Amino acid sequence: MQSSLFINFITFFILITIISVSAGPIKCPPINSTASNSTQKRYVVFLSNDKTHYKWLKECYNRTVQSIKTTKIPVDKNSILDISIKGKFYAYSTWYYPEFAKKYLSERPETILVEKDLRVKINQCPKKNESSTNLTVQTNPTFNLDRIDQANFPLNKKYIFPSSAGSNAIVYVVDTGVLVTHKEFEGRASFLGAFCVGCPDTDDNGHGSHVSGIVGGKTFGVAKKVKIVGVKALDSKGQGTNADIINALIFVLIDAMEKKNNAIINLSIGGQRSEALNKVIKLLTDNGIHVVVAAGNEASDACLTSPASELSAITVGATEVKTNDITNFSNFGKCLDIFAPGRNITSVGIQSNTSIATFSGTSQATPHVAGTVALIISKFGNQKPDEMIKTLVKFSTKNLISNTKGSPNNFLRIPPP
């Protein structure tokens, strides 16, 4: 009996020793750089789970964790902005020295992706004309609206659209903000939040308001009854970072999931190809949100940029005013889905609540498609994002555009009334 107890005690002691040794102290590799010229960079980090990662950062480096649900902007470079959605997605953004990110962070077993933050900008040509005007109901629509309700030229000076007009859809415009008080929006526009440091809760650039007017303005909009939500992630120059865009997109996903609305995102921005940004857009479309993105204004392959290269998004190129030619600035290639008017588009300005402005760019082509998605939802009901792409292509005019440079030859056409 004593022998049996002694063996059991020895076995228990060995097990405790093994557990203690295997658990051991948390390893804390040096987080600061020894190089005199090294500076901290912002990174977006994707994880397989967050069970041990945040504990490691807190215990080793005293990093504080904030949730995107309560904090839209990082407090400082020592804070972690957690954008995880439990059971779906685990990620955060913060600042690290490049040596630490590459040598230690990337090698942790739960780390999926470590990407240095990249710059993004609006896809709008710089020249603009803006004036303050008291708008009245126009007898004739702007040329771009006239163009997308018919197969080809000549234009018939009418814009004929379904009477539901996007009424049960919502378009989140992730951009420079929206002048929600502009009369074009008729009280249908609201503001969700700002995600860039030092940015006010309004549009101090004009790009986001202009884009929103094309989506759903009473005079200049494709879907004249759609609800518009402004999400500010770009500054007064129309510039920003992938990390801020990603934070904004995750916040939109949370908002759309809570409200269970028929959500569409208009993303008239572009930058270098980013695996992190593309992954987030795929997360959005996997959760039923339609993401419409600009092809870009570099007159090059859209597959080299993001978000245009994400295949689950609806990528839009731009065409000319009086012809079916691609504009000389529009990106092109197999990553595109459809083309829409993008030259000399008149819409909302920000000088006053009645001002109008004229811009060009794939930024302007994109909201034509976002508005059309709203029309389809209000007329036929919502669809999965991959099915929506097929529906847009079905309604589009085929083989009309000259010199597509490897792009699908689809020109936007709204559904019939």
Enumerate the language-model features and the residues they cover:
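Autoinhibitory N-terminal propeptides
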Residues: 6-73, 82, 110-125, 383, ...
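N-terminal domain-start motif of subtilase-like serine proteases
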Residues: 26-35, 96-103, 129-173, 195-203, ...
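Substrate-binding/specificity loop regions of serine endopeptidase catalytic domains
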Residues: 238-245, 267-337, 344-370
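Subtilisin-like serine protease catalytic core
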Residues: 140, 158-190, 199-244, 258-264, ...
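Acidic glycine-/aspartate-rich tracts in secreted/extracellular proteins
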Residues: 50-52, 98, 119-120, 177-180, ...
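Structural recognition of the beta-strand scaffold that forms the well-ordered cores
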Residues: 43-45, 93, 170-174, 213, ...
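C-terminal subdomain of the subtilisin-like protease fold in secreted/lumenal serine endopeptidases
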Residues: 226-230, 250, 254-283, 287-289, ...
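Autoinhibitory propeptides
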Residues: 31, 69-144
